[in-house]
Amino acid sequence: MSKSITHLVLDTGGIICSSTLLRNSAESFYTIPRVIAEIRDETSRKNFELWGDQVIQRVPKPEFIKKVSEFAKQTGDYSSLSVTDIQILALTYELEVEFNGGDWRLRKYPGQKHINGKPPSNSNSTEDASKPTSSDTASVKETENSDPKSAENEVLEGETTQHSNNKEAHPNTEENKEQEDNEEDDEDDGWITPSNIRKKKAEDGVGESLVQPKHLKVACATTDFSMQNVLLQIGLNLVSSDGFKIQNVKRFVLRCHGCYTVVKDMEKKFCPSCGGNTLIKTTCSINSKGEFQVHLKKNFEWKTRGTKYSLPKPVHGTSNGKGKKNPVLREDQPEYQRAVRRMQRKKEIDLMDEDYLPSLLTGVTKDRMYVQIGAGRKNPNEVRRKKR
């Protein structure tokens, strides 16, 4: 039995679910050491043992990590991707270049319409098969260029002759119409039948648009929507392990809810105009006129609960840097600037580190990759239980 995928890159979700359909869909499987390190609980370890020696661990090259990172920054998904996610995307990119004869069909920036170069000679046959034939295009052009007035006259003539024939053959037309209307109302009560199932699928957006090609050389199995968004915009093949897949690709920007400033740097936490922590991730697009549009949520309300609370007294620094720290409230605070530099440096080192050791071997358990702003996500005015 021939497999539908030759090389499949697995995310953590694809390994944990251990789907039989996923294991039987590809000839070879790839992942990175970070994914194996994320599998910690007993149930997930047992599911990973079902894969046996089928999964090949491989670290992507730094050049592909750099390409994927730059592309994710342009789509606005870079801040939502972890180091593991970026390496999974880079490994898929590397395998696509290796087994598909280069990056001729991949996009270098979002929205690119033309390919990068000529495809290899062995893929010409598949491309020619997907192109429409000259007879098909000619028939389409003929129907488009035909005179609409003559077509309307023919339809009207046909309707008048059919109407006159029906009058002669069926004198009781009103009774027949009432019976037909009643029958149609009884049939179309919302039931899905074999006759209208295609129409229902087309209305729901499920149909031929989601059908995968017969054979894929390289694909990636992930359940993360940010990774799926980057994969589809680059042009890489996507396989969903749990059946949930995005239908439309999106680009994101940050919009300040206080002063309505649009910020394209997705790593920003504070608005560069008003300085508040009021940036919200929103989708954006460019219309046919070339105008930039931001798509806001309908009836959106900014939650003010937990935004007013008492601040502790400022604490002076210590020589060793330990002790209580002042809460981060603005971007120009030294505490925030040091934390941002530390995170950027650590992320760059981890992305380019080929000699990566999992946290199970190094013993590092707590390593936050974000800065707590203010009181954090929890409501500081909420009454909490006392610890015993």
UniProtKB/Swiss-Prot annotation:
Repeat keyword on record: no
Entry GO CC: cytoplasm; nucleolus; nucleus; preribosome, small subunit precursor
GO terms, biological process: maturation of SSU-rRNA
Region described as Disordered: 110-206, 311-333
Domain of life assignment: Eukaryota
Keyword flag Nuclease: yes
Biased composition (Acidic residues): 177-190
Localization of this protein: Cytoplasm; Nucleus, Nucleolus
Keyword annotations of the record: Cytoplasm, Endonuclease, Hydrolase, Metal-binding, Nuclease, Nucleus, Ribosome biogenesis, Zinc, Zinc-finger
EC number: 3.1.-.-
Transmembrane segments: none
GO molecular function: RNA binding; RNA endonuclease activity; zinc ion binding
Pfam families for this protein: PIN_6, Zn_ribbon_NOB1
Main enzyme class: hydrolase
InterPro entries listed in its UniProt record: NOB1, Nob1_euk, NOB1_Zf-like_sf, NOB1_Zn-bd, PIN_dom, Ribonuclease_PIN
Function noted in UniProt: Required for the synthesis of 40S ribosome subunits. Has a role in processing 20S pre-rRNA into the mature 18S rRNA, where it is required for cleavage at the 3' end of the mature 18S rRNA (D-site). Accompanies the 20S pre-rRNA from the nucleus to the cytoplasm.
Quaternary assembly: Component of the small ribosomal subunit, ribosomal RNA processing complex (SSU RRP complex).
Official protein name in the record: 20S-pre-rRNA D-site endonuclease nob1
Record organism: Schizosaccharomyces pombe (strain 972 / ATCC 24843)
Gene for this chain: nob1
